[in-house]
A protein has these predicted regions:
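Terminal, compositionally biased segments used for targeting/anchoring and flexible tails
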Residues: 1-106
């Protein structure tokens, strides 16, 4: 058994899930608008900077403020769809990781 082949099979399985397809489709749709893509990248960079420069309690407050600043942006249909589908994909992946962990601990 070659683990690399199993990894490729697993990745292909993930690519064929509705969660991945929906996330990818909404990402492509979002990226069609360069301004929205740029705003999303700016938000992500600001969020990452906050998490790397502040303690957790302070970071949480800063993130809440950042999210308020971007609330109109988050409510745009293409952004909202991307965020929703990304959360669904991440949830699916989290469940996969938990299943793998469960199998490893048997």
């Amino acid at each position: 058994m070659d683990i690399n082949n199993k990894v490729k099979e697993f990745a292909n399985f993930i690519k064929n899930t509705n969660e991945f397809k929906d996330m990818n489709k909404s990402k492509i749709n979002l990226e069609k608008n360069r301004n929205l893509k740029k705003q999303l990248d700016t938000y992500i960079n600001k969020k990452n900077t906050i998490y790397s420069n502040y303690r957790m309690e302070d970071a949480s407050k800063k993130i809440m403020q950042l999210n308020k600043e971007y609330s109109d942006f988050f409510n745009l249909p293409s952004v909202s769809n991307y965020i929703k589908h990304t959360k669904q994909f991440n949830s699916m992946m989290e469940n996969l990781y938990k299943s793998i962990e469960k199998e490893l601990l048997k």
